[in-house]
C-alpha cells in the first residue's frame, strides 16, 4: 500500500513551508535537504520540535508527524561584557548578595550554562540561582567584611561552564570597588510590574516607568537603573533609561514570534546597595498578518472524463495572528465545476464537482480567496489555472448530411470532382481525421476504378473518364475516422451525378443513310400545299438540351417547293405542284442538336413526282386504333410484303389510267416509296407513339419483284374521332 501511495505522488510539508525534509519515492525514507541548526530553528525553546505533514496525492491522504531536533554542544558560553564593575559599601554585612551578569549560551539543556566559578579570594563566594526562564545565574556572597582603608579595589575572574561533553567555558573580569558606608537599599514600588503592549507599537514607545526609592541622602541616595540577568531577546527589544527607570521599545514586537517578555531590572544606589523588580510585558495581537496560502500540489491538465471529486489541487492556509484574527474563511468563485473541501487541519482540497467537458470549456482560471475574521478583515487571493485535457469522446462530424457532386462526362483522369469535410470537436491527435472510401453496397459497382479520396483532406478524384451514356450517376459512402484511442468514426453518403456533354451527333433513323439504295418518296402532282411527303426521324444519344433536335432544309433541287418543319422533321410541300416542276428532286435535311457547340447530321431524301393515282380504301377494321398502336415488327413486315406486291400491279394500272384521264386527279392522302433499285423493305413509325402526326399512322415500303396483285392504302385516321362501333369498309380492287 505504501508503494502505491508513493507512486501516486508524495511530499513533505512543514508548518513554515520550508523544505527541511524530502521523501524518497523508492523506499519512503525521509531525507534531510540541508543541515539543521537547532538554535536558528527554536532558539532557547526546548524541546525543539518541527511539525510537518506527509501528503499522498493519489489517493489523497494526510499523515501528521513531528521532527525532534536534538541539541549538540556547539556553542561556548559568553558574557555580554568582557569586564564588570561592582561597587560595594565597606559597611555591607556578611552574607549580602550582589548581582552580577550571567553568561549566555545558545545551547540548551545540559549543553547550556550549568555552573559558575570565581577565582579564589577571601571576601566572596558564588551562589547559583534559577531564573523564571529556567536559566542559572550567579550572585556574589560577601564572606568577609571589607575595609576600604586596607583594600579599596580588587579583581575577580568569573567563569561560566556548560554541561557538554567536552565542556565549554567562558570568562569575564569583575572589578570590585569598596565604597563608604550606605545604610538603606533601594526599593521598587512593585515586586512585579505587568503591562500590555500592542504588537503594532512604534519604536521608542514608552512601555513602563519603574521607579525605586532610597532613604539615603547624598550620593548614597542616587539610583541607577539597569537590566539584570535578561535574555538576548529582551536586550535587543527593550532598553531602560539609567536615571529615570523608563523602559522603551527598541525593536518591533511580533506576537507571532514572542507573546511575552520577562524583564528583570535593578536599581543600584551610590553605596552599591540594589533593589530588584520584574516587568512582565504581554504582547497584544493585532490583525497585521494577512492569511497565507501555500499551494502543495496542482494537477493540470486534468482529463475531461475525470470522475467527480477528483483532487485538482491541495493547499494549506496559515494566519499567524491569534483568535479571530487568525481564523479564516476560504472560498472560490461561483458557477465553477469545482468545490473546496477541508481535509486535515488547515489543508484544503480543490476537487471536481461533476465531469468536465473540454469541448465546452478547456481552461478554468480559479481564484482562491482566504479572508480572516479580524478587524479590519484581511484577505489573500491566489490564482491558479486548470487546463482540461482532451479525451476522444467525439466522433468526426461531416459538414453536410450528404454530398452531391457533379462531373461532366469525358473528364480527364485524376480530375478533382469535389471534397468532403468532417470536423472533430476533440483536440490534438483525437481531432486528426482520416478519410476513406467504404465498400459500396452494390457489389457490381467498380468504385475503386471510378474514384479515389485523399485520406488527409477529403478531396475526391475521378480515376477515369466517365461516360454519361454508360453511367449517369452512382453513390458511395465515405468514412471519417479520428486518430484517438479507440478511434471514432462516422460516414456520409456521396452521390456523383455525371453531366451530359454534347459528345454524340444526331443519328438519322429514317431514311437510312447507310449507303444502300436510297428510298424514293412518291408525291402526286395534285398534292395540296402542306402535303406530307415524308418525315425525317433522328435520335441523339445525349440528354437534355444536347438531345433537343431541330431540322432544317439544307439543299433542294428546286428551292421553295418543299419545306421541313423545324421541330418534328416533317417534309411537306410548300406550294402547289405544276407540270413545269421536275419529276425528280433531291433534298438534303440538316439535323442539329441544341448542345454547345452543336452537333449535326444530314439526311438525303429523293422525291419522285407522279401524275396521280387513286386512293384505295382500307377497311376500318384494319385501321383500328388498337391495331395501329401495336408495335409488333413482325405483323407490319407481313403487311408490308403484301402491299409491295399489290403496289406493283397497281402501278401498271395507274399508268394506263393516267393516260386515259389526265384531268381526273384523284386526291390521295397515302404515300408510298418506290425504290430505284431492289432493296429490302422498311417499316418506320407506324405506332401512334412515334414522331409522325396522328393523321398519318401508316408507312408502306414496296420491294421490287413483288408477286402480289393488289395493295391497300390506309385512310387518314384521327383516333379521337373514331368510335368503337365504326364500320369497316374495303377498297374495291383494281
Swiss-Prot record:
The family database entries (SMART domains) matched by this protein are listed as: CA (SM00112)
What domain of life?
Answer: Eukaryota
- Set out the biological process GO terms recorded for this chain's protein: cell adhesion; homophilic cell adhesion via plasma membrane adhesion molecules; nervous system development
Where primarily located? membrane
Q: Where in the cell is it found?
A: Cell membrane
Cadherin domain residues are: 1-79, 80-188, 189-293, 294-398, 399-508, 515-621
Q: Which GO terms of the cellular component aspect does the record hold? A: plasma membrane
Provide the leader sequence positions. none
Q: Tell me how this protein sits in the membrane.
A: Single-pass membrane protein
The record's annotation in Pfam families points to: Cadherin, Cadherin_2, Cadherin_C_2
Q: Which CDD domains does its entry note?
A: Cadherin_repeat
List residues traversing the bilayer: 638-658
Could you list this entry's UniProt keywords, alphabetically sorted: Calcium, Cell adhesion, Cell membrane, Glycoprotein, Membrane, Repeat, Transmembrane, Transmembrane helix
Q: Return one GO MF term.
A: calcium ion binding
Q: What residues bear carbohydrate chains?
A: 115, 365, 383, 514
Described by its record, this protein's role is as follows: Potential calcium-dependent cell-adhesion protein.
Name of this protein: Putative protocadherin beta-18
Source organism per entry reads Homo sapiens
The opening ranks of the lineage are:
Eukaryota, Metazoa, Chordata, Craniata, Vertebrata
